[in-house]
Swiss-Prot record:
This is S-adenosylmethionine synthase. Keywords: ATP-binding, Cytoplasm, Magnesium, Metal-binding, Nucleotide-binding, One-carbon metabolism, Potassium, Transferase. The gene is metK. Binds 2 divalent ions per subunit. Binds 1 potassium ion per subunit. ATP binds at H16, D167, A168, K169, R233, F234, D242, R248, K249, A265, K269. Mg(2+) binds at D18. It is an enzyme of class 2 (transferase). The lineage of its organism: Bacteria, Pseudomonadati, Pseudomonadota, Betaproteobacteria, Burkholderiales. Homotetramer; dimer of dimers. Its cofactor is Mg(2+); K(+). One of its GO terms (biological process) is one-carbon metabolic process. GO terms for molecular function: ATP binding; magnesium ion binding; methionine adenosyltransferase activity. It is found in: Cytoplasm. One of its GO terms (cellular component) is cytoplasm. PROSITE patterns: ADOMET_SYNTHASE_1 (PS00376), ADOMET_SYNTHASE_2 (PS00377).
Length: 395
């Protein structure tokens, strides 16, 4: 890669239609896990103008009012007026859930005992990543993109910018020099708005109240290109502007394109699905590698076969930044982390109703107390085993 290059990531707000769908799916998952933590859940959501469709496969003993959960989630996001794209009070909600296929269940149903040989719920490959670009050990472009739309939502909710509406998108381009963030080149922010706000006032407020307070001062060098609502108008938004579907923002959910993605979405899936749980474990492993000082960048790939507990492969790539060899780090990963599906569930305590919070602003790089995969609690053990000093202070 060139020594001087630009890299871009994007995020979307909680009011983006695909994120509305993700949040409904994870709200339903949480409600089910709160009653029956051994449920099998694959909850998919579609939302369009005035319509929400709930479908997928659910096997549970829980008694859940799915329609009310969907309405409550839409209300929490802020869609309480048809002018915004959907109204939680008046939208139709259709429910079409089946049970999990018994052919799949027979390979993963050993979850009620201490047998760690519970098989993976599907085949697939998952990635985890961490780097030292931010204190959260995340790539800078996706980190800033999330913080922009998160601030947009906060200013909308507290009334400081009352003309903001729930739907929004952000995009940040960072200039890298010698592999490190050097400066911010371009920021794009498109936000849904009330029809009576004029464009110059909107652009000034977004730049001064949302964008500038979010950007790190040490990365503001020269003129930054600010592109705010570049089409000129964004009144029609949310599910009215675009049909929303669960699982369509998988790059937003992870590393903003800075790392590969195995293709499996997260939201609506219980942790027996390795699409979700193994991706969380990959982040946990990668973050501990970087926090331990073993490397400044770490990419982990794991893969599984349906019904088989042991991963079919584990790979570590530190892109030449490792203080010990990638082979040594891979050996340490196998020694310190149980990457069998049941082992992951126990290691990260994943049978909890914690998932709705993950469904907007990124599954990774957020210091939420429920996000066990963000802990660096194995960094010291890894550092000691490798004979290096930890890169971050570890309690």
């Amino acid at each position: 890669m060139a020594n001087d290059y630009l890299f871009t990531s994007e995020s979307v707000s909680e009011g983006h239609p695909d994120k509305v769908a993700d949040q409904i799916s994870d709200a339903i998952l949480d409600a089910i896990l709160a009653q029956d933590k051994y449920s099998r859940v694959a909850a998919e959501t579609l939302c369009n103008t005035g319509l929400v469709v709930l479908a997928g496969e659910i096997t549970t003993t829980a008694n859940i009012d799915y329609i009310q959960i969907a309405r409550d989630t839409i209300k929490r996001i802020g869609y309480d007026n048809t002018d915004y794209g959907i109204d939680y009070r008046g939208c139709a909600v259709l429910v079409a859930y089946d049970k999990q296929s018994p052919d799949i269940a027979q390979g993963v149903d050993r979850a009620h005992d201490n047998n760690l040989d519970q098989g993976a719920g599907d085949q697939g490959l998952m990635f985890g990543y961490a780097c030292d670009e931010t204190p959260e050990l995340m790539p800078l472009p996706i980190h800033l993109s999330h913080r922009l739309v998160e601030r947009q939502a906060n200013l909308r909710r507290d009334g400081r910018l009352p003309w903001l509406r729930p739907d929004a998108k952000s995009q940040v381009t960072v200039r890298y020099v010698d592999g490190k963030p050097h400066s911010i080149d371009t920021v794009v922010l498109s936000t849904q708005h009330a029809p009576d706000i004029d464009l110059p006032a909107l652009r000034e407020a977004v730049i001064e109240e949302i964008i500038k307070p979010t950007l790190p001062a040490d990365l503001i060098k020269g003129d930054i290109k600010f592109l705010v609502n570049p089409t000129g108008r964004f009144v029609i938004g949310g599910p009215q502007g675009d049909c929303g579907l669960t699982g369509r923002k998988i790059i937003v959910d992870t590393y903003g394109g800075a790392a590969p993605h195995g293709g499996g979405a997260f939201s609506g899936k219980d942790p027996s699905k390795v699409d979700r749980s193994a991706a969380y474990a990959g982040r946990y492993v990668a973050k501990n590698i970087v926090a331990a000082g073993l490397a400044s960048r770490a990419l982990i790939q794991v893969s599984y076969a349906i019904g088989v507990a042991e991963p079919t492969s584990v790979m570590v790539n530190t892109f030449g930044t490792g203080r010990v060899s990638d082979e040594t780090i891979t050996k340490l990963v196998r020694e310190h982390f149980d990457l069998r599906p049941k082992g992951i569930i126990q290691m990260l305590d994943l049978l909890r109703p914690i998932y709705e919070k993950t469904a907007a602003y990124g599954h990774f790089g957020r210091e939420e107390p429920e996000f066990s995969w963000e802990a660096a609690d194995k960094a010291l053990a890894l550092a000691e085993a490798a004979g290096v000093e930890p890169a971050v202070q570890v309690a």
